[in-house]
Amino acid sequence: MDRLQLRENEIFDALNRLKARRLVIIGGYAVNAYAQPRFSVDCDIVVEGQPEANAIGEVLLGSGYEKEKTPKTGFHKFERYTRSIANNFVVSFDVLIGGILDRQTDVSIKADWVFKNSEVRQLKGKTITDRLNARIVDVDALFVLKMISCRSTDIRDLFMLAPSIRDSAWIRGEVASRCDFEDRFKKVKEKITSESFRDGLQGVYGLLDLNVFEKSKKAIMALGNDTASPRNATRSRRRI
């Protein structure tokens, strides 16, 4: 088993040990529940408060993890737990307490929004055959989080998630209520229409059929053409 397999195996083992805890998986591992799996450096989870974070910390510390010092953000606190495997190859969990702070935009999203927009789904890895059921942020809410942040990694994830989104008007409304949707969409559009984007995407996700690539691209572009009212979309969306 190579180091990447060891990392995924350890993440899955730890998540199995955390099955009784009240948490929502976000980030790269959440993407794997809706799209072709990719490697992720760490596992990000959201909890509602410090008591649950403490309980999760006890499980991780008892499983060989160490708690690292983390900076205070001024909004939502987070705790990082790391474990060294295979000659200092590190596995890490980030526990976000009370919500999510996007450092790129200073947008803060509360944990209750994350929990309200989550569902129990089957989680899968990139290199292992293991499967587990876990509470994961739903695909539309994950798309919102990724679009607000809009880093290169997020844009690649957005591209892969796009064919699975359920309510584009709701997504537009949630993004627009927190930042400039048109600015975010412009950044996404510029990236996915660049000549180098497909090669970069395949470097992360593996070989993609051209038809699959074009389907995702079409889904992203359709989001920019959606003319539904963001305010009405936010009010009317069915929660899962």
Residue ranges and their predicted role:
Residues 1-240:
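Compositionally biased terminal segments of proteins
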